[in-house]
Amino acid sequence: MTDIFIYPQANLIAGVDEVGRGPLVGAVVTAAVILDPKRPIVGLADSKKLSEKRRLSLYDEITDKALSWSLGRAEPEEIDQLNILHATMLAMQRAVAGLHIAPDYVLIDGNRCPKLAMPSLAVVKGDSRVAEISAASILAKVTRDREMTELDLQFPEYGFAQHKGYPTAVHLEKLTTFGATEHHRRSFGPVKRVLGLV
């Protein structure tokens, strides 16, 4: 971990991160993780900096060794209704609420915190500075990537397994050719344009 982070004085600290704010399709997925200090996990890092194979291996280790972990999500309809920022905050609240052990303190990746029942702190670049947030980023990314692979089986013409729903040139081309699926976020510019909403 670079840029040493000074932990707050608390016994049970949860880390929270999200994946999927930028894509044009699918849910934004969040995870909350309370690690077990007696069962350390070696190699935790920002999920984006790990190979897929390493992420999958760490996913299994995190879900096995963590004191508690939980996933949260906000669906495309909620994103369209609330906007992506508020939907992400809602998904983070859901992840924390899903923990079977209530944390004393929550560390959140980024620069803002959702409203929570316990103290929280936003940590910029937290996914590479705080082990709990790194673990959450891995759970969220593996989960969302799996969902995109499943969506790819339903809609093979879009290439979701490759671009994970992000607005790549390939995705934008397929969107123009085939139109939007019911899983696309209608409030996002490229989807709006295809649907004739702008």
Curated annotation (Swiss-Prot):
Keywords: Cytoplasm, Endonuclease, Hydrolase, Manganese, Metal-binding, Nuclease. Manganese or magnesium. Binds 1 divalent metal ion per monomer in the absence of substrate. May bind a second metal ion after substrate binding. A divalent metal cation binds at residues 17-18, 109. Its cofactor is Mn(2+); Mg(2+). It is found in: Cytoplasm. It is an enzyme of class 3 (hydrolase). SUPFAM superfamilies: Ribonuclease H-like. Pfam families: RNase_HII. The keyword Transcription regulation does not apply. GO terms for cellular component: cytoplasm; ribonuclease H2 complex. Residues 11-198 form the RNase H type-2 domain. Its EC number is 3.1.26.4. It catalyses: Endonucleolytic cleavage to 5'-phosphomonoester. GO terms for biological process: DNA replication, removal of RNA primer; mismatch repair. It comes from the Bacteria. CDD domains: RNase_HII_bacteria_HII_like (cd07182). Endonuclease that specifically degrades the RNA of RNA-DNA hybrids. NCBIfam families: PRK00015.1-1, PRK00015.1-3, PRK00015.1-4. Belongs to the RNase HII family. This is Ribonuclease HII.
